[in-house]
Amino acid sequence: MDLEKLKEETQIIIDDVLKQTEIKSGQVFVLGLSSSEVNGGLIGHASSAEIGQVIVSVIHKTLSDKGIYLAVQACEHLNRALLIEEELADKKDWEIVSVVPQLHAGGSGQVAAYQLFKSPVEVEHIVAQAGLDIGDTSIGMHVKHVQIPVRPISKELGGAHVTALKSRPKLIGGERARYE
């Protein structure tokens, strides 16, 4: 796989998704990543540390430059726990759990983020305002209600299907209510 091309395509996708989701500084963005799918394999069966490093590095830098927190979802072997900065866990009062991600228990994205973050910790539950799913990893459980699908500029990254979500407040009150 051409890692330079992967880097460029990841940048195009994250820039587009951030524009569409309108996520703001201080908010949380969740990433679900299957490097196996990006590599043309079956999720969880062909993990690549190099692919994870390229993708997470691009997304982490882009979000950090905008003051947006990154949460990286683990694979099912860690119950889809999330790697975040300890500062965010403290700020949101999210319970920290003990585990260090590995390539086949957490995944390549978490391993890369663990190396990039200043003070990485794992938590079981978060509420993100938006997210990017590379490889059909099912990030919906981590995105605030009401979730709205976002169609990224590119539908694939390598061999992986790419989708995204944003959220909006619930509309309540019925026909008498006004929303804007």
Swiss-Prot record:
| Family annotation (Pfam families) | DUF436
InterPro entries for the chain: Antibiotic_NAT-like (IPR028345), DUF436 (IPR006340)
Family, according to the entry, reads as follows: Belongs to the UPF0340 family.
The UniProt entry, under NCBIfam families, shows: TIGR01440 family protein
Q: What is this protein called?
A: UPF0340 protein llmg_0465
Source organism lineage?
Answer: Bacteria, Bacillati, Bacillota, Bacilli, Lactobacillales
